[in-house]
Design a protein with these regions (language model features):
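Active-site donor-binding acidic/aromatic loop of nucleotide-activated sugar
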Residues: 2-10, 17
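A conditional alpha-helix N-cap/helix-loop micro-motif detector
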Residues: 6-7, 36, 73
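Structural motif corresponding to alpha-helix initiation and N-cap regions
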Residues: 8-12, 40, 77, 107
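Nucleotide-sugar-dependent
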Residues: 12-17, 24-47, 54-65
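Localized chelating/binding microdomains
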Residues: 14, 19, 44, 49, ...
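Short amphipathic alpha-helix with an adjacent loop that forms part of the alpha/beta core around
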Residues: 16, 83-86
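A charged, aromatic-enriched C-terminal amphipathic alpha-helix characteristic of glycosyltransferases
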Residues: 75-78, 88-117
Length: 117
């Protein structure tokens, strides 16, 4: 099987599943609640773990990343075959994905605050 839904998982149980995963699913269908722009912790965790992922909202920190697959922010069904094809052609190594978000660390974000005061 290509897609397995496990329900809510936390801690070590979640870590075990991440070890088996190839790709992640971020927020989808947020347009239903009127949200178009968002910065989810979920997206950042996936990148920190070295995963490519799909999401539908606008997250300026990831919009141009090569390891991202964007879904339309509407009711269009997501074609799993397109997700699988994206994963198969994905060449960004996990460490490169992790490195791409170094500027999002608490240290870097707090430096921006400190420098502005």
């Amino acid at each position: 099987p290509y897609v397995i839904l496990h329900g809510a998982k936390h801690g070590k149980e979640l870590d075990v599943l991440f070890e088996k995963a190839d790709f992640a699913v971020g927020s989808l269908a947020r347009h239903r609640s009127g949200i178009q722009n968002i910065k989810t912790l979920k997206n950042r965790e996936y990148a920190a773990r070295g995963f490519g992922f799909i999401y539908s909202e606008t997250d300026d920190d990831f919009e141009k990343m090569p390891y991202i697959l964007k879904a339309p922010a509407d009711e269009t069904p997501i074609e799993i075959s397109k997700v699988i094809a994206f994963c198969k052609k994905q060449t960004t190594p996990p460490q490169e994905i992790r490195d791409s978000i170094r500027n999002l660390s608490w240290k870097e974000q707090m430096k921006k605050v400190y420098d502005s005061i």
